[in-house]
Amino acid sequence: MNKYSLVAKIEKIAPLHTQEAWDCSGWIVDNPDVVDVKKIMLALTVTDKVYELAKSKNCDMIIAHHPLFEVPIRYRDMQIYSSHTPMDKAENGTTETLIRRLRFVNFKIENEFVRVVEQKISVSELKNKLKQISPNLRLINNNGTETVSKIGFCAGSGSEFIDCGDYDCFVTGDVKYHTAVETEKVVFDIGHFESEILILDRFKEILGIEVVMSDEKSPFI
């Protein structure tokens, strides 16, 4: 398999030019002498454990969501590519994949990272839906609200967007303490890992080939 052809499929949906200035999406390790790859592993984050598993499974390429800002020398025998904020912003990207997994049908684009579902639902019912993805989620409901009708979603770290829209509920993966204390909205912190791990299935769908999935688990118990 030509590694550049595979990456082109991802970049057609999540172009690199859309990444944030601080992001390091793209080729993390790109050995120009290696064009064809035999087996690919998909991972949320490339760690030592993920790298060793890829080697043990005879993978010669890893496609990950999170980029590496520093690359250990020993990783350089593995072709590594990441699509982080481009995939977060993309149509059917990280946040939209989360919404669809929850079986919400319609949503609107609030901004590059946030999608909004307009549907009246009880807080308890929404909590039960989210628990299917994140059993250990945290609920912030400072006003004891029982029903919401406009839900903002942002997979990953979305704390900065909680009060950026007129939604009355927000679902994200990381909520800062002081934001949680001060917000008037219903907020679900479902965990960074849980909110983004679903994107690996989307990567597989985009590539249209057999892949090896990493066995990553959330670091929080």
Residue ranges and their predicted role:
Residues 1-221:
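Active-site catalytic microenvironments in core metabolic enzymes, especially phosphate/sugar-handling
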